[in-house]
Regions:
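A non-catalytic structural micro-motif
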Residues: 195-197
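A polyanion-binding, active-site-adjacent surface
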Residues: 3, 15-160, 168-170, 175, ...
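Generic N-terminal amphipathic, Lys/Arg-enriched alpha-helix
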Residues: 1-13
Length: 220
């Protein structure tokens, strides 16, 4: 199957595109877009990959589901389009950045600038029905995104994987801690942020690790 995705990712993920589960997933997604309002817009389903080529990835942040409100999701986990009110988790992410490294919250919740520096902002499920959180879970996306994470973890070394909350931590359980830095904490959601997300210093710890391995730090 010919999938429109950035070329270096295509080289690593083509075996997935040729599997039966991905064909079934594609049929499901096409059907959903034809009948319902689905986020993100179809052209942005693989935005995380297109903005952050395989060879440029330095950091991976794993999310769960795209935002399901109008105008929010654009294919990057935790990120929203310019001009959209910051969701609560993103507010808390910016609070932790301020406390950790002193950088003030930006005027936009659009994290494209992180992606362009080598931060793969990957949701486990890449599509969702409007106003129905989790509606596209267990349809095959998780298998595909597992394959993407595995390709990175096996082909590269000295990456930073940031896993907030139990869902992301389970998804990243197979990552070799001897080859990569794996940072875990509570999720930035208001329900859990005070249980270990605040004060995790993941942003400075990421940059310290990158610097120690000869990589440019991320401008958070």
């Amino acid at each position: 199957m010919n999938v429109q995705i950035e070329e270096s990712w295509k080289a690593h993920l083509q075996p997935e595109f040729d599997k039966d589960y991905f064909r079934t997933l594609t049929e499901f997604v096409i059907s959903e877009y034809s009948q319902y309002q689905i986020f993100p817009p179809g052209r942005l389903i693989f935005n995380a990959f297109n903005l952050c080529p395989f060879d440029k990835v330095k950091v991976v942040i794993i999310g769960q589901d795209p935002y399901h409100g109008p105008g929010q999701a654009h294919g990057l986990c935790f990120s929203v389009n310019d001009g959209v009110q910051f969701p609560p988790s993103l507010v808390n992410i910016f609070k932790e950045i301020k406390a950790d490294i002193g950088t003030d919250a930006p005027t936009t919740g659009n994290l494209t600038r992180w992606a362009e520096q080598g931060v793969l902002l990957l949701n486990a499920t890449l599509t969702v029905r409007a106003h129905q959180a989790g509606s596209h879970q267990n349809r095959g996306w998780e298998t595909f995104t597992d394959a993407a994470i595995r390709a990175l973890a096996e082909s590269k070394e000295h990456l930073v994987f940031i896993l907030w909350g139990s869902y992301a931590q389970k998804k990243g359980a197979f990552i070799d801690r001897n080859k990569h830095l794996v940072l875990t904490s509570a999720h930035p959601s208001p329900l859990s942020a005070y249980n270990g997300f605040f004060g995790n210093k993941h942003f400075s710890r990421t940059n310290d690790y990158l610097k120690a391995h000869g990589e440019t730090e991320i401008n958070w």
